[in-house]
Swiss-Prot record:
This is ATP-dependent protease subunit HslV. The active site is at T13. Its EC number is 3.4.25.2. It comes from Xanthomonas campestris pv. campestris (strain ATCC 33913 / DSM 3586 / NCPPB 528 / LMG 568 / P 25). The lineage of its organism: Bacteria, Pseudomonadati, Pseudomonadota, Gammaproteobacteria, Lysobacterales. It is found in: Cytoplasm. The keyword NAD does not apply. A double ring-shaped homohexamer of HslV is capped on each side by a ring-shaped HslU homohexamer. The assembly of the HslU/HslV complex is dependent on binding of ATP. The gene is hslV. One of its GO terms (cellular component) is proteasome core complex.
């Protein structure tokens, strides 16, 4: 069965990370959907991580798996103190610890210098253009962000917010209840 047709699968989230003018913003919508029903409209899927809150993170996918990814990543961040190193160390653990298995989630993480996608299979990906878009409406948000970056002077926070709003108008699993954090 196609996962989008399974009434027991949680569909949730569009997350976008945008860089402009020395700033980075991570935004996410607030909708959580179970099957064909909206279960919650104001979930907070974007957070600050690390001792000083200098890493932004947003998640897409199964909530329990996403929170597991958050916890594991934050532990590595606390231990190593640097975004890329923490992500690589988490990926190494993935390859060696069977208990981690395959988590059905993605994290978008960013600090002042770097943006990364961390997958539930242990992959770490740095986008070439500094834009990350994950989740059900990710393609729509990515398209909107690229257009706004290319053709406006809007700041990173505004672009991220508008990208989520545009995705929310198109994707049935995304709403316009935006939470955004910026560095």
């Amino acid at each position: 069965m196609d996962p989008s047709q399974n009434p027991n699968v949680v569909h949730a989230t569009t997350i976008i990370s945008v860089r402009r003018g020395g700033h980075v913003a991570v935004a996410g919508d607030g909708q959580v959907t179970l099957g064909h029903t909206v279960m919650k409209g104001n979930a907070r899927k974007v957070r600050r991580l690390g001792r000083d809150g200098q890493v932004l993170a947003g998640f897409a996918g199964a909530a329990a798996d996403a929170f597991t990814l958050f916890e594991l990543f934050e532990a590595k961040l606390d231990k190593h103190g640097q975004l890329t190193r923490a992500a690589v160390e988490l990926a190494k653990d993935w390859r060696t610890e069977r208990r981690l298995g395959k988590l059905e989630a993605l994290l978008a993480v960013a600090d002042k210098e770097t943006s990364l996608i961390i997958s539930g299979t242990g992959d770490v990906i740095e986008p070439e253009d500094g834009i990350i878009a994950i989740g059900s409406g990710g393609s729509y948000a990515l398209s909107a962000a690229r257009a706004l970056l290319a053709h406006t002077e809007l700041d990173a926070k505004t672009i991220a917010t508008e990208a989520i709003n545009i995705a929310g108008d198109i994707c049935i699993y995304t709403n316009r209840n935006v939470v955004v954090e910026e560095l």
